[in-house]
């Protein structure tokens, strides 16, 4: 049985599987990680952490940026590309196991702090069985890129435009150097253009691992999740059409991440577009600030490698009114008028629909 080198693994992943970037971190870089996020809690014998990226096609953001077509991002680039990442994880895992080493896939999931225990807490002071390794932190430690102010991973090739996969293995592979503070220039356009006002302008959190430190904003996870799920009127025409009288100002919401998750799932069946999308992981906001504005800025400043012939956009992001229309409450709570040919009241008349 042949041994496995880092270069052999990378050549297979890039040239055969088709991943766009791949990096390797030794398990020692994760020393001090909380047990509920540690690779060693998942696989104590792990010696290497492999993180790879598949790019998000830039054009997938065009429909949401124009306000005309959500499936190109939601179905294709978000949930669809995630499935391709899983396929790549499987093929790379087979390659590793063909060389006699174990391959442990770690798909993305909410952490214990975000979602809470999904079952009874184990006796004896053990952590609940909800260990999830942070793919973004692992990507930084594997040398793939850095975390921008928004907390989104930025790579030298694509900026914020990729989905990540992670594999733990007992193969001892040559690691890649950590590279940080090279891409994000703290322009803070992600703050300005986040429709949920979830990205803090000044307040940050410092992360330290493997002897390096970096700072990201103190993200308001609850507001992020509400907007991500389409509960923000300013960027979700689907919500406005079904709930024209509901007012949910993002700045006044104090929910947790899991409250936003549960609230969104409780409403998906009520909104036809969401009901269709909810068979997949849902992302109605389209990452307007944390990806689109960031990507556009980094391309214009030539801070990333994947550059195009034309700017993605030179327009400010569109927004719908946050408040219901003046006079909307004239329906007095009724939704049907049998004396006027069954006219349905309370609906918003707009060329969006």
Per-range role (PLM):
Residues 33, 74-75, 81-296, 311-313:
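Catalytic cores of enzyme domains
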Residues 292, 300-330:
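C-terminal/domain-terminus segments
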Residues 28, 56, 173, 200, ...:
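Flexible, active-site-proximal loop/turn residues at the rims of small-molecule/cofactor binding pockets
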Residues 343-353:
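Intrinsically disordered, low-structural-confidence terminal and linker regions
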Residues 1-90:
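Non-catalytic, usually N-terminal nucleic-acid engagement modules in DNA/RNA processing proteins
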Residues 339-341:
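A cross-kingdom feature that marks long, compositionally biased intrinsically disordered regions
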Residues 61-63, 234-240, 301-307, 353:
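Short conserved micro-motifs at the rims of enzyme active sites and ligand-binding pockets
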Residues 331-335:
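Charge-rich alpha-helical segments
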